[in-house]
Amino acid sequence: MELDPSDSNSRVVDASQFSKYRDAGALVSKAFHQVASRCVPGASTREISSYGDNLLHEYKSSIYKSQRFEKGIAEPTSICVNNCAYNYAPGPESVIAGNDNSYHLQVGDVTKISMGLHFDGYTALISHTIVVTPPPQPGMGPYIGPGADAICAAHYASKAVANLLATNNSDDPITGSRLRKIVDDIASQFRVSVCPGSRIRRISRFLVGQPTIDRLEEDQNTKHAVEWPAPEEETRKADVTNSLDPANVLSTELNTWHVMPKEAWLIDISMSSQPISSLKEHPDLKPTLYIHDVNVSYMLKLKASRSLLSEIKKEKSVFPFHFGSLSSERNLLGLRELTDRHILVPMPVLISSPSNVIAREELTVITQPNPSSDLLCLTVPTPPSYVKSDFSLEDGTDAALICEGINVNIKSININV
């Protein structure tokens, strides 16, 4: 594994890289559709998450058998329901005295499925929101309410961003401020809020926005991203700049770069039915997902810690992993020392208030070499559940024109791999 964010050539997707992106997208999409079919009333989120990871392991082992590069899960399967935003992936720890204490899906649950796969560091991530419904019955209506507003907003926002990326050309460059504005406008029209953690960012080999290595790009000034932190974090950044107009500072920062042909981009938009001051760590659920911070080193005291770190370096790379996927229970004894020394960073289960509903859409795309109104979507776009919002895109607005008025051919990969 080599991380070199300063290498500008690594940003242009060549034929070899394209094949790895394509295969990662095809296989993670195939796994996703099988996982989604299991999201039915009464289903165990632990069993669904485990099933998704098993599929990813099976699929990644089915190709590139003679190649000696890294391949594996880039994001463990998580099943986040209603007000849960990120990182709920219950494992063996949720089984107590033979009872599965993980959350079991119920009718009406707004359920976000997230997973990812990589080959040689070329990554495809996907998230999609579905509504858990009972078996179809005559006269069954759509899902309605604030959750439906959030689902519609996330759907149209991800579509609008994809359309903008597809129409990029040198005469009308797509900048970060344009991408941010269209997402914020759609949230406003559906009377919802963009959830902290949402992002639109350029990705490259091994670099998909992991917090532990994100600063490598920041240090090299090669990070091209639109991010939605919590409101208080945006205020803090504005205070640091001592600006009288924080919006102008943000706009200036986002206009220093623009989208280029043959780049890989991650679109990850979450919408909240209510404004969120911040996401909070779940008070009772311990993290099951961890990520190795390659920037931190320490002379470990415990043999179990050294053994565990060796396994992680060999098998997990720089991507998040589920602690249940570690091979040896003995090695798990070293988990505490690795986290205490910040070599492993836990990814807590993040939630908002119980009355809130969050919807998420995430897809990975590659811009085409010419401004041909084509975009290659590595993860197969999935239509939203049967929902109905009281709101819609307002006629004549940029959001409506971009979503519905631009003739964009979003090409999908073939998932029959």
From Swiss-Prot:
Swiss-Prot/TrEMBL GO biological process terms: proteolysis; ribosomal large subunit biogenesis
CDD domains for the chain: PA2G4-like (cd01089)
Gene Ontology molecular function terms on file: metal ion binding; metallopeptidase activity
Localization, UniProt: Cytoplasm; Nucleus
Coiled coil: none
Principal localisation: cytoplasm
Enzyme class of the recorded protein, top EC level: hydrolase
InterPro entries tied to this protein: Creatinase/aminopeptidase-like, PA2G4/ARX1, Pept_M24, WH-like_DNA-bd_sf, WH_DNA-bd_sf
Assigned EC number: 3.-.-.-
Cellular component GO terms, alphabetical: cytosol; nuclear envelope; nucleus
UniProtKB keywords: Cytoplasm, Hydrolase, Metal-binding, Metalloprotease, Nucleus, Protease
Top-rank lineage group of the source organism: Eukaryota
Reported function: Probable metalloprotease involved in proper assembly of pre-ribosomal particles during the biogenesis of the 60S ribosomal subunit. Accompanies the pre-60S particles to the cytoplasm.
Subunit structure: Component of the nucleoplasmic and cytoplasmic pre-60S ribosomal particles.
PANTHER family linked: METALLOPROTEASE ARX1-RELATED, PROTEASE FAMILY M24 METHIONYL AMINOPEPTIDASE, AMINOPEPTIDASE P
Family listed: Belongs to the peptidase M24 family.
Protein name, UniProt field: Probable metalloprotease arx1
Naturally occurring in which organism (per UniProt): Schizosaccharomyces pombe (strain 972 / ATCC 24843) (Fission yeast)
Species lineage: Eukaryota, Fungi, Dikarya, Ascomycota, Taphrinomycotina
Gene from which this protein is expressed: arx1
